[in-house]
A protein has these predicted regions:
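N-terminal carbohydrate-binding/catalytic regions of secreted carbohydrate-active enzymes
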Residues: 12-125, 274-281
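Active-site beta-loop-alpha junctions enriched in small/polar residues
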Residues: 14-18, 43-48, 106-110, 134-138, ...
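Glycoside hydrolase catalytic-domain groove-lining segments
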Residues: 61, 66-76, 82, 207, ...
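Active-site groove signature of glycoside hydrolases
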Residues: 120-150, 174-181
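Structural recognition of alpha->loop->beta junctions
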Residues: 125-129, 139, 189-209, 278-281
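Aromatic-lined carbohydrate-recognition surfaces of secreted/lumenal glycan-active proteins
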Residues: 162-188, 249-265
């Protein structure tokens, strides 16, 4: 006889499915391979409807541009977010298999309130879900950071978060910035204070190893754009980040919406081993 614990879980595991590097994989196939569902399935989209290349995926619209970095296109090279088709088919597929949808959406911070309300209303039918808005916004590579200041990005998050809470109360907003710094403060803490307060969930992305020069160079000793860090370093960074954010903005959940070890850097064996070490830590 086996005993089951019906209380709250000690942790939860989500699965990213599709990004700038990969197509969406249907949930029947994933469940057949892994044998069990996850709490949520993450999907990634972009929304820049006023750009001249829209609604094409930007890498296809600008296939003749001289690009040397994944994020050098006019807007982010995720699949385009639109009112019908791909995003909604995927969310229905996720929900059919008893999982929550975790949408990441990079979008134009100059969109009107009417346009933002339209996006929020489209999320109503999909039950409990999260939306991560303009993620990794402490960086410089995504379009929202190229076109807007950090303060503008933070204020936009808070404003869009308010609209989502009004129009789609089933949706929790996720603010994804950086980690606590050497001085103890969060990265861009002052500029992002309003966003930390407005969010339902905080996130910080974590790649123990990452080939960020993909697909334009090779991750090899002496060449290529890549990095590798220790499990212990990231575990300490998460702890310090949560403690600082909670002390300044009240306790909220902190997740890592993107976590992996890039097999381009480590190879598949160490990729799996390092993820296990992080989970055990």
């Amino acid at each position: 006889m086996q005993k089951l614990h019906l209380g709250a879980a000690q942790c939860a595991l989500d699965l990213g499915d599709g990004s700038e590097r990969a197509e969406y994989v249907n949930q029947d196939y994933i469940l057949h391979k892994l044998g069990r569902p996850h709490r949520a399935i993450g999907i990634m989209y972009t929304y820049y409807p006023h750009d001249k290349q829209w609604p094409q995926r930007i890498s296809k619209a600008c296939k003749d541009m001289n690009i040397t970095f994944q994020w050098d296109y006019p807007y982010d090279d995720y699949f385009p977010f639109n009112a019908d088709g791909q995003p909604w088919e995927q969310m229905r597929d996720i929900r059919r298999h008893g999982q929550d949808a975790a949408l990441t959406l990079t979008l134009d911070c100059s969109l009107s309130d009417d346009e933002l309300r339209e996006v929020a209303r489209m999320l109503r039918p999909y039950g409990r879900m999260t939306i991560r808005i303009n993620h990794e916004c402490g960086g410089t590579w995504f379009t929202h950071n190229k076109r807007f200041t950090y303060e503008q990005v933070g204020k936009f998050f808070a404003h869009f978060s308010d609209i989502i809470h009004q129009e789609a109360p089933n949706v929790r907003t996720v603010f994804c910035a950086g980690f606590a710094q050497a001085d103890g403060k969060l990265e861009k803490e002052d500029e992002f204070a309003v966003a930390y307060r407005a969010a339902d969930v905080w996130s910080a992305d974590c790649y123990l190893a990452l080939h960020y020069g993909w697909p334009y160079d090779v991750a090899e000793v002496g060449g290529g754009q890549y990095k590798a860090d220790s499990v212990g370093m990231y575990y300490d960074m998460f702890r310090r980040t949560y403690e600082r954010a909670s002390s300044q903005f009240g306790a909220k959940p902190l997740v890592t919406a993107e976590f992996n070890t890039d097999g381009d850097v480590t190879g598949p064996r160490h990729q799996g081993e390092s993820v296990i070490r992080f989970a055990e830590a």
